[in-house]
Design a protein with these regions (language model features):
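Solvent-exposed soluble domains appended to multi-pass membrane proteins
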Residues: 4-20, 25-28, 33-224
Length: 224
């Protein structure tokens, strides 16, 4: 009730709603701002493109509740607003243990579904059944899910140099192609990338930050 009253007060002078536009939520695998790590300095900005976007629009920070694995748990928390800290520690994977057993799982994209109809789409350049994403996205109300396999497949996915997974750029191109081909200007698009998924090694040529590698003394097990 307290939050409802606060929301009503904030929205009382607003004429537009978020669901009147297309919102793209990107969870970029392993992405963080390295300039925020203490004890590390850079001769140039490692993320100039993102920084330029942040400097010209509304932006902020999101604190990740985990690192080193469990990508789908971060995704679950971002989509539902539910913290894994609220559950028993034996719950190691919400997508595999919790969501399949929920009668009506709530997720953020449903705000568009309820107002615009079938208004949410998901993209993930990997196998659709990983972490039960295919069935969970359906439970969340996504009407289409583009992945490596299945009925709706992503196309022209490319890798960078020796990297194992599809590049973020080619993933985003799939999203842009989809948006250019649809007349729907009021929808929610969920994007989960794969480019920087583990394992971590010297995949990229001409990496100007290689001299700052802090993993040279790690064992093979620690790298994984």
């Amino acid at each position: 009730e307290r939050y409802t009253q606060t929301a009503e007060l904030i929205n009382s002078e607003r004429s537009n709603e978020m669901t009147d536009s297309t919102v793209i939520m990107i969870l970029s695998e392993s992405f963080s701002d390295p300039t925020r790590v203490s004890g590390i300095s850079f001769s140039e900005d490692p993320m100039p493109a993102i920084r330029s976007v942040k400097n010209t629009t509304t932006s902020g920070l999101m604190v990740s509740p985990a690192y080193g694995g469990g990508t789908a748990n971060i995704e679950f928390q971002a989509l539902t607003g539910l913290s894994m800290a609220l559950y028993d520690p034996t719950l190691s994977s919400a997508y595999q243990q919790l969501v399949p057993n929920m009668d009506n799982p709530f997720s953020f994209n449903q705000l568009w579904d309820s107002k615009q109809g079938d208004g949410s789409v998901a993209f993930h350049p990997y196998n659709r059944n990983m972490y039960f994403r295919d069935r969970n996205y359906k439970s969340f109300g996504f009407n289409r899910f583009y992945a490596l396999d299945g009925e709706d497949q992503m196309t022209d996915l490319a890798k960078i140099d020796a990297a194992w997974y599809a590049s973020d750029e080619s993933t985003y191109c799939n999203v842009l192609d989809y948006l250019s081909e649809t007349d729907d200007t009021e929808q929610f698009v969920q994007v989960v990338t794969m480019q920087n998924h583990m394992p971590y090694d010297s995949w990229y040529q001409n990496n100007q930050f290689i001299d700052g590698d802090t993993s040279v003394d790690l064992t093979d097990d620690e790298r994984v």
